[in-house]
């Protein structure tokens, strides 16, 4: 899988250098992150309706290798500051990801909702988990990506702008991370 993503990164760089329209430049992004902003690629986030300021910062961090994930670092490398703004605005205008058709197990959903309230997820990410400004939209994000990301915050292998996510995730167990990911992926 990693080889495929790396190959796509090189294709993106080649296409971007020769692309004439923005749609042509965005096509490789949508190949992994979903044509309509809803990813079907394992452990790859859906970008639809993501907050533009958040997307801008993430793209900048990838370009500057402040956030390291090689395919994204390679793809962001040739982007100018204007390109970063254009891409982040484009991402924000994609349709928001649809909730899973599976509404989820009611007991597990209630348990995870209580956990989300206990850890004040709704304070930063909004009560509907739509995000705001430089706080990401997490509502209806891919469950596998949510679990992976929350686990990375817990073990400090992923860093945010400050230590708040690591602080929040510190006491959360692996089982609770799975429940939170399950809930947020299905929130209505």
Residue ranges and their predicted role:
Residues 5, 10-18:
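Hydrophobic h-region of N-terminal signal peptides that target proteins for export
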Residues 18-36, 99-127, 142:
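Sequence/structural segment immediately N-terminal to covalent heme-attachment motifs in c-type
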Residues 37-67, 73-79, 113, 117, ...:
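Gly/Gly-Pro-rich "capping" loops immediately C-terminal to redox-active cysteine motifs
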Residues 38-39, 68, 93-107, 128-136, ...:
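Inter-heme linker and motif-flanking segments adjacent to c-type heme-binding CXXCH motifs
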Residues 77-99, 144, 170-188:
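C-terminal capping alpha-helices of c-type cytochrome domains
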């Amino acid at each position: 899988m990693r080889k495929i993503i790396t190959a796509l990164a090189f294709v993106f760089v080649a296409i971007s250098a020769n692309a004439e329209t923005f749609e042509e430049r965005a096509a490789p992004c949508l190949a992994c992150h979903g044509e309509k902003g809803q990813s079907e690629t394992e452990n790859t986030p859906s970008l639809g309706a993501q907050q533009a300021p958040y997307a801008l910062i993430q793209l900048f961090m990838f370009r500057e290798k402040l956030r390291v994930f090689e395919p994204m670092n390679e793809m962001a490398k040739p982007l100018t500051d204007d390109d970063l703004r254009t891409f982040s605005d484009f991402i924000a205008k994609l349709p928001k990801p649809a909730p899973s058709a599976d509404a989820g197990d009611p007991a597990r959903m209630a348990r995870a909702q209580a956990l989300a309230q206990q850890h004040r997820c709704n304070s930063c990410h909004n009560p509907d988990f739509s995000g705001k400004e430089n706080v990401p939209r997490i509502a209806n994000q891919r469950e596998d990506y949510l679990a992976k990301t929350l686990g990375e915050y817990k073990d400090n292998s992923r860093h945010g702008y400050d230590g708040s996510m690591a602080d929040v995730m510190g006491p959360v167990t692996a089982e609770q991370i799975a429940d939170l990911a399950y809930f947020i992926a299905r929130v209505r």
